[in-house]
């Protein structure tokens, strides 16, 4: 489906962007877009509306899935990361297996539109929770904000971070960050094989 296509394309951009702008802003903005575009799916009167909105939802919903791994790396040290990463890694396998089963019963009982209304409620709750309770976890972004605050409070330009000293234009930095996932995909065999396995898994389910 187009949702799965969007789900596969989105991470190529969102993961690198989180290293420039931070995790929190991407969580909040992409989840908001996803929540908004669930509504047209629920009230769609033609297949075109449904396809376009599902594609946008797939792209937007891929961001949290992509960023959680980085967020866990921000929060736990290498030796403490095993259990959180294992719990997170199981979600992509459990979700596609359980989701169609539950969704099938709900669709028969309430109608297919109610699947989107239920998804809207759950997604809106997650957006509110993340937007208003989750803090920034990416260290360079946190340090940049602290340095900016210290410059303002102390009226001194001596407080800068390594990220701020990077004088490369934003376009050049974006190009490097956005190309990196594709380089890993085609150069690193383990990344390529896992990606092929996951694509077959999602295609079958």
What are the language-model segments listed below?
Residues 1-205:
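A six-helix transmembrane bundle that forms the core substrate pathway of small-molecule transporters
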């Amino acid at each position: 489906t187009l949702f799965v296509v969007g789900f596969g394309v989105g991470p190529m951009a969102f993961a690198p962007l989180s290293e420039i702008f931070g995790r929190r802003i991407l969580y909040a903005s992409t989840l908001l877009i996803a929540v908004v575009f669930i509504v047209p799916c629920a009230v769609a009167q033609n297949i075109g509306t449904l396809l376009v909105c599902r594609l946008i939802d797939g792209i937007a919903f891929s961001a949290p899935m992509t960023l959680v791994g980085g967020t866990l790396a921000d929060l736990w040290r290498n030796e403490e990361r095993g259990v959180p990463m294992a719990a997170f890694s199981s979600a992509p396998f459990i979700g596609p297996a359980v989701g169609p089963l539950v969704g099938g019963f709900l669709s028969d009982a309430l109608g297919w539109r109610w699947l989107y209304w239920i998804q809207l409620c759950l997604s809106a709750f997650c957006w509110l929770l993340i937007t208003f309770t989750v803090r920034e976890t990416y260290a360079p972004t946190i340090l940049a904000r602290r340095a900016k605050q210290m410059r303002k409070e102390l009226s001194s330009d001596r407080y800068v971070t390594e990220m701020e000293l990077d004088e490369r234009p934003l376009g050049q930095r974006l190009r490097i960050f956005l190309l990196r996932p594709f380089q890993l995909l085609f150069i690193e065999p383990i990344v390529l094989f896992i990606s092929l396995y996951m694509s077959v898994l999602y295609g079958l389910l």
